[in-house]
Amino acid sequence: MKTSDFDYNLPQEYIAQKPAEPRDSSRLLVLNRQSGELKSCIFRDITGYFQPGDVLVMNNSRVLPARIKGIKQDTSAKIEILLLKSDGNGCWEALLKPGKRTKPGTIIDIRKQDGQIHIQAEVLADKEDGIKLLRFSDETLLMKLGEVPLPPYIHTPVSDPERYQTVYALTNGSVAAPTAGLHFTPELLERLGDMGVICTYVTLHIGLDTFRPVKEEDPSDHIIHREYGILSAETAAAICQAKANGKRVFCVGTSATRLVEQASSLSQNGIIELYSGWADLFILPGYKFKVADCFITNFHLPRSTPLMLTAAFAGWPLLQKAYEKAINEHYRFYSFGDAMLVL
């Protein structure tokens, strides 16, 4: 298995620049792993694939206003900060743009446009993959100074930043949205609940790996970034009950899937339990899924870890056929694009 196996060509015009309106009007490509059938429909019709007692697991992490603009104190040059992860003590891992010439000791002034809020960031150290360690003079003001970061391939401003949040987003912590969940509306979730589907939530704060291509020739050499996650006792109980009753677990997105699989792999008896901690499970083809029975996801970037997880779940040959069909039928790709359901 090589990283180049997960490459494909996508015309730029297929990259969705705006979200579907309404959310559940996006297209849905359904992959049946047993029959190999590929079927197109509208996302709101996904209800037809659920049965009473099935469990739907969603990631309720909320995207931080992690994009912050500042000015380097020594040169007055503009600089952009993308917050990645806090250490809980006022320091953050971050990406700087431009960043190569920004050395430890650099002071960055950050002001709100009205000038009423002013803090400073000091670059403390260089880390791997171009990441910098920053210390802020007042960490409590960061959320008032930033804006929600959009992926680098989206060039059209979004009029409503909430369109890059799921309708059930709750806990701040991600630098990218769990995009498979962007298709759900409150009404669609209510319909699923009325059908007897158990809607549950986990929290996994999404980091850099969502956009970062795997550069190693052998994907198993890639070190995935750790992301903090919480799986509650209530969600664990719902999953266990579904399994005991012969019902299915539908995971929404690669983040929810990784967290439930990590929690299962760390339990002594293989039964999913309450989990709180770092998630660093890198799922590649050949992995045996223990929790997820069905999988809802978007169309992912070439050579990315989410694409590799999807290939592990669907099977790469079938997934390649699905991507070919999606391109031929002008599906919309990436964060604001259409969705897939893998059964």
UniProtKB/Swiss-Prot annotation:
GO molecular function (one): S-adenosylmethionine:tRNA ribosyltransferase-isomerase activity
Enzyme class name: transferase
Catalytic function, reaction form: 7-aminomethyl-7-carbaguanosine(34) in tRNA + S-adenosyl-L-methionine = epoxyqueuosine(34) in tRNA + adenine + L-methionine + 2 H(+)
InterPro entries the record matches: QueA, QueA_dom1, QueA_dom2, QueA_sf
GO cellular component, one term: cytoplasm
Keyword Cytoplasm: yes
Domain of life where this protein originates: Bacteria
Gene3D superfamilies: QueA-like
Principal subcellular localisation of the protein: cytoplasm
Pfam families named among the record's database cross-references: Queuosine_synth (PF02547)
Subunit structure: Monomer.
Family of this protein: Belongs to the QueA family.
Known role: Transfers and isomerizes the ribose moiety from AdoMet to the 7-aminomethyl group of 7-deazaguanine (preQ1-tRNA) to give epoxyqueuosine (oQ-tRNA).
Protein name stated in the entry: S-adenosylmethionine:tRNA ribosyltransferase-isomerase
Taxon lineage: Bacteria, Bacillati, Chloroflexota, Dehalococcoidia, Dehalococcoidales
Gene from which this protein is expressed: queA
